[in-house]
Amino acid sequence: MDKLTIKASNPLAGEVVISGAKNAALPILMAGVLAETDFIVSNVPSLRDVITSCELLRCLGAEVEDLGGSRIRISTTNLNEYCAPYDLVKTMRASILILGPLLARYGTADVSLPGGCAIGARPVNLHLHGLELMGAKIEVKEGYIKARVDGRLKGTHIFMDMVSVGATENLLMAAALADGTTVIENAAREPEVTDLAHCLIAMGAKITGIGTATLKIEGVERLSGCEYRVMPDRIETGSFLVAAAVTRGKIRCVSADPSALEAVLSKLEDAGAEITTGEDWIELDMKGQRPKSVNIKTAPYPAFPTDMQAQFCVLNALAEGTGRVTETIFENRFMHVPELIRMGADIEQEGNTCIIHGIDRLNGAQVMATDLRASASLVIAGLMAEGTTTVDRIYHLDRGYEHIEAKFQGLGAEVVRVK
């Protein structure tokens, strides 16, 4: 099993090209099921979860072709299976996003209950309740969600009991081919949801309220393929910016989207970073100074993203002063904390809050990645640790970061993959 070894770094310096967003690419690939003609997705990152999504589409009978240059073509002409099996779904929670498209276009879907990161229950009941309101008959049996609808799904009014990105995406895709108008209230506003909505519009969907908590979808008879470019990955961008801040460096992220990262950029400025942005780039300069501690509290977009929480734990662990990090989205999302403590970090956990007292340097150690973002935080920690840090179980990292060691090497870091 692959590992990463990281040695203490000089301040990171240079330019890094940001990949397409995993969390936008996955639902957009699933949306290919809705299209009656060829659908081409560009700026698709080369990641384990993307490979799994393509395998899932092939399993359903779709034709999936890698066109090179981060472009994938999907054809559903021969799609003739409507079951997403356990052996694929167990490795990736986003597989649940095939449910809405299959049901909307074909009237039937069997989807294994999902797996993926071990960071809390993330219940699928919001997905199922919304589809039931649209007329689907659903039962959960033998580990599978079995959904059927006679004719087309029906437009309806859905109020989400809690903000859920995945449920919003599933219902948005289902509503695009429903009979009548669907209104989703308390919808997720994340940029990845907005990206999916723009993709559906390019396919012929009628959606208003994009970027707000109320989405209105007028169902159409059919959707057609198009070519759509996936948005830049805001979490990858934020991770590299934090790495530069921690190492007191200066980097520029290109092919990025500053507008999707405002809460993170604001906190980096609070930490002492000088931030400069253009239309598609972000530059961070620490002027050689140690970052200052910051308080963060995760919440749905446009507030601070839960997927940047672990990285800011590392920033606070190496900052001047004491910072508080509060997690409100997922339970069990501080699994990186014991590993950081093994590296010498001074962290106290009180429920869903960590109180982090900054120190000047960590110590290299052998640590274990427990989920995707935790693994990124451990790599960043290794950049400011005396000696060598080894991160095990980096298959988590490969689910969400494209060519991460090569990108760090390009910024001057000693990050090496060991087979």
From Swiss-Prot:
- What is this protein's function per UniProt? Cell wall formation. Adds enolpyruvyl to UDP-N-acetylglucosamine.
Per UniProt, UDP-N-acetyl-alpha-D-glucosamine binds at R93, D307, I329
Predominant subcellular localization, coarse grouping: cytoplasm
Which Gene Ontology cellular component terms are annotated? cytoplasm
Q: Where is the active site?
A: C117 (proton donor)
Pathway membership = Cell wall biogenesis; peptidoglycan biosynthesis
Q: What's a Pfam family this protein contains?
A: EPSP_synthase
Listed as disulfide-bonded, the cysteine pairs are none
Q: Which residues bind phosphoenolpyruvate?
A: K22, N23
Residues that the record marks as modified (2-(S-cysteinyl)pyruvic acid O-phosphothioketal) are C117
Localization of this protein: Cytoplasm
Q: What is its EC number?
A: 2.5.1.7
Q: Which UniProt keywords apply?
A: Cell cycle, Cell division, Cell shape, Cell wall biogenesis/degradation, Cytoplasm, Peptidoglycan synthesis, Pyruvate, Transferase
The reply on keyword Amino-acid biosynthesis is: no
Q: Which reaction does it catalyse?
A: phosphoenolpyruvate + UDP-N-acetyl-alpha-D-glucosamine = UDP-N-acetyl-3-O-(1-carboxyvinyl)-alpha-D-glucosamine + phosphate
Any one Gene Ontology biological process term? cell division
Specify the domain of life of the species encoding this protein.
Bacteria
| Phylogenetic classification of the source organism | Bacteria, Pseudomonadati, Pseudomonadota, Gammaproteobacteria, Alteromonadales
What is stated as this protein's family in its record? Answer: Belongs to the EPSP synthase family. MurA subfamily.
Cross-referenced HAMAP family: MurA (MF_00111)
Q: What is this protein called?
A: UDP-N-acetylglucosamine 1-carboxyvinyltransferase
Query: From the UniProt record, which GO molecular function terms apply?
Result: UDP-N-acetylglucosamine 1-carboxyvinyltransferase activity
